[in-house]
Amino acid sequence: MRRRRAPKRPVMPDPVYNSEVVTKFINKVMWDGKKTLAERIVYGAIEKLGEKGEEKGIDLFFKAIENVKPLLEVRSRRVGGATYQVPMEVRPERQQTLSIRWIVDAARNRNERTMVERLANELFDAANERGAAFKKREDTHRMAEANKAFAHYRW
């Protein structure tokens, strides 16, 4: 284990929307260090979102991330030989990270032809409270609700 917590590294806002969240999203989409390709995919998806919905693409993008953010999650805790799933609140930074991760993973598992289409459709679904990423959030909340009895094991 490390002696102290690793310092948070600053994230540069992206050049198009001047947003750190978009940069984090691009970094999550990126594979093998191909950032230019990841940028093309994310910006293309946001543009497509704007054509799909009646709102601006970037507004739908933020709405999608907001809708997928989990408020509660379960974490394993060992107590006297038994492992309990303890529901806990999620810190805001982790909420954002999980939201981005779930959206990107859900987009990768979709069946559309290009990643731009997959990402745009997943973001659109998430903005409208449906789709695989939103379902993942609901499942997480359901798990936390089911294990509410173990909430007193929180640490």
Curated annotation (Swiss-Prot):
GO terms for biological process: translation. GO terms for molecular function: rRNA binding; structural constituent of ribosome; tRNA binding. CDD domains: uS7_Bacteria. The keyword Methyltransferase does not apply. The keyword Membrane does not apply. SUPFAM superfamilies: Ribosomal protein S7. GO terms for cellular component: small ribosomal subunit. Signal peptide: none annotated. Keywords: Ribonucleoprotein, Ribosomal protein, RNA-binding, rRNA-binding, tRNA-binding. Part of the 30S ribosomal subunit. Contacts proteins S9 and S11. PANTHER family: RIBOSOMAL PROTEIN S7. Belongs to the universal ribosomal protein uS7 family. One of the primary rRNA binding proteins, it binds directly to 16S rRNA where it nucleates assembly of the head domain of the 30S subunit. Is located at the subunit interface close to the decoding center, probably blocks exit of the E-site tRNA. This is Small ribosomal subunit protein uS7.
